[in-house]
């Protein structure tokens, strides 16, 4: 069996490609809108589809990966992810484009769960740092791709190229990963019956709103050269702080790290109200991007690593709620009240997430593990 560092590296590479569905949208959406004559709300549909489908696919794919191992599930998911980009490039209209994007999003979601939980299962002793390093790829991949997409200027050429590269890289790589044996944990059924799971769920759904609002709608708030700069910088920022905040979670505990990330994310959103767009994007990118790994770290500590791909996949579905709030709802508030109202909405969501966590007692206490069979 390869050394566990190999699995960490494989998870990182998979994450680099996973980020392309989320963090290229600020550049692809205006191109698609111009080519197909779509408005702001119609452009937001693609991002909403991605968030909902990718998150809903995770629990089912995660359960299969926990049961049968990640190889076959990962390879099939890699094919779907690649075909999503290729289908988007070839689609003659928005309906088929949305269909292709949805199928690809399902593959991306399952791959995300496998990549993240390679770190969870192999690095219980350095959980925060390891998951942070793997998740660094979720920003870095798009930071490399976005300038290339902007230089091409044609969404069909860009998405076709991405899809072909994914077929060549992700499919063989997915066949080379595996999970360790002999882990303990709490089954998804027991996790769902624990009130703390739903506390984490509601809090994450709200806490993700600032990050996902900028991921889907940054082009509504800034324009021109600043948009290209920030759209390229944003995913890099999203990944950059994940190892640092993950290491802090190992030292302080994940709950304290979550509070810090939510507070700075809310402050960054409010900074944009004062016209400090670059400061705000940096603050939200650095801390908002780390929020998901901190919630999944806390979930893994409570419920254990054995069923982590499924349990974390269930928790990750809260991103579908957050994505709907951060794309469709954010766009609706923007249409009604402009940038100021929509940014206030995003900041209030992060503050509400903190309040939900504070109301739950004994949040960090591990749940007794299922008996080994």
UniProtKB/Swiss-Prot annotation:
Record-linked InterPro entries: MFS, MFS_dom, MFS_trans_sf, Oxa_For_antiport_fam_transptr, Proton-linked_MCT
Pfam families with a match to the protein in the record: MFS_1
GO cellular component: membrane
GO molecular function: transmembrane transporter activity
Listed SUPFAM superfamilies: MFS general substrate transporter
Protein origin, superkingdom: Archaea
PROSITE patterns with a match to the protein in the record: MFS
PANTHER family: MFS DOMAIN-CONTAINING PROTEIN, MONOCARBOXYLATE TRANSPORTER
Comment field (misc): No homology was detected between this sequence and those flanking other archaebacterial rRNA operons.
Record protein name field: Uncharacterized 38 kDa protein in 23S RNA operon
């Amino acid at each position: 069996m390869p050394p566990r560092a190999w699995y960490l590296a494989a998870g990182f590479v998979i994450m680099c490609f996973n980020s392309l569905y989320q963090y290229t949208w600020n550049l692809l959406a205006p191109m698609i809108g111009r080519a197909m004559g779509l408005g702001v709300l119609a452009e937001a549909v693609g991002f909403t589809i991605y968030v909902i489908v990718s998150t809903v696919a995770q629990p089912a794919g995660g359960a299969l990966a926990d049961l049968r191992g990640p190889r076959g599930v990962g390879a099939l998911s890699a094919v779907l992810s690649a075909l999503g980009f290729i289908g988007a490039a070839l689609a003659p209209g928005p309906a088929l484009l949305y269909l292709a994007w949805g199928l690809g999003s399902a593959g991306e979601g399952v791959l995300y769960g496998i990549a993240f939980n390679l770190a969870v299962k192999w690095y219980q002793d350095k959980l925060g740092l390891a998951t942070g390093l793997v998740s660094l790829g979720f920003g870095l991949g798009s930071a490399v791709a976005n300038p290339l997409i902007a230089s091409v200027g044609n969404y069909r050429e860009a998405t076709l190229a991405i899809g072909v590269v994914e077929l060549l890289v992700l499919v063989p790589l997915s066949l080379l990963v595996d999970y360790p044996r002999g882990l303990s944990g709490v089954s998804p059924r027991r996790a769902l019956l624990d009130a703390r799971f739903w506390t984490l769920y509601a809090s994450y759904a709200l806490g993700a709103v600032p990050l996902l609002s900028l991921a889907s709608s940054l082009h509504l708030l800034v324009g021109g050269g600043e948009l290209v700069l920030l759209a390229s910088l944003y995913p890099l920022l999203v990944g950059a702080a994940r190892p640092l905040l993950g290491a802090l979670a190992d030292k302080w505990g994940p709950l304290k790290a979550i509070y810090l990330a939510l507070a700075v994310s809310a402050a960054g959103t409010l900074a944009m109200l004062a016209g400090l767009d670059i400061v705000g994007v940096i603050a939200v990118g650095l801390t908002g991007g780390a929020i998901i790994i901190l919630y999944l770290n806390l979930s893994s500590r409570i419920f254990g690593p054995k069923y982590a791909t499924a349990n974390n996949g269930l928790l990750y579905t809260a991103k579908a709620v957050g994505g709907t709030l951060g794309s469709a709802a954010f766009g609706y508030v923007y249409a009604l009240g402009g940038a100021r109202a929509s940014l206030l909405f995003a900041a209030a969501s992060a503050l509400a997430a903190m309040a939900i966590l504070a109301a739950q007692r004994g949040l960090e206490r591990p749940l007794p593990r299922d008996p080994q069979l």
